[in-house]
Amino acid sequence: MDDSKVVGGKVKKPGKRGRKPAKIDLKAKLERSRQSARECRARKKLRYQYLEELVSSRERAICALREELEMYKQWCMAMDQGKIPSEIRALLTGEEQSKPQQNSSRHPKAGKTDANTNSLVGN
C-alpha cells in the first residue's frame, strides 16, 4: 500500500516535517551572526559602564554621609562637654531671627484656631 496520506484534499508524501530550510548563503548567515555578537558585546559594555558609574556615585554618596555622620558625632561630643558648636549656634540664631517674622504672621491664624477649638469644646 502507498504511504502517502490524503489531508484536506492534498496528497502528502512521507518525509521530513516542517519547513524545508531555504538555501541561505552561509556567508551571509555567518555575517549576521557576527553582527549580532558585536551588538551584544556593545550592549554589554554599555550596561557595565552604567553600572560602574552607578557604583561610583553611590560610593561618593556614602563618603559624604560618613563625613556628615562624623560631624554630628563631633557636635554631640562637644555638647556632652557643655560646649555649643558654632554651627549649631548659627542655626539657632538663624531660627530666632526668623521666628518673630513667622510668629507675627501666625497670630491671626492662631486666633482663628483658638476660636474654633473653643466652639468645639463648648458643644
Curated annotation (Swiss-Prot):
Output the PTM entry: Phosphorylated by AMPK.
Q: Where is the composition biased (Polar residues)?
A: 114-123
Task: Name its cellular compartments.
Answer: Nucleus
Q: Which domain of life is it from?
A: Eukaryota
Role description: Probable regulator of CREB1 transcriptional activity which is involved in adipose cells differentiation. May also play a regulatory role in the cell cycle.
Family per similarity comment: Belongs to the bZIP family. ATF subfamily.
Protein name per UniProt: cAMP-responsive element-binding protein-like 2
Q: Which organism is it from?
A: Mus musculus
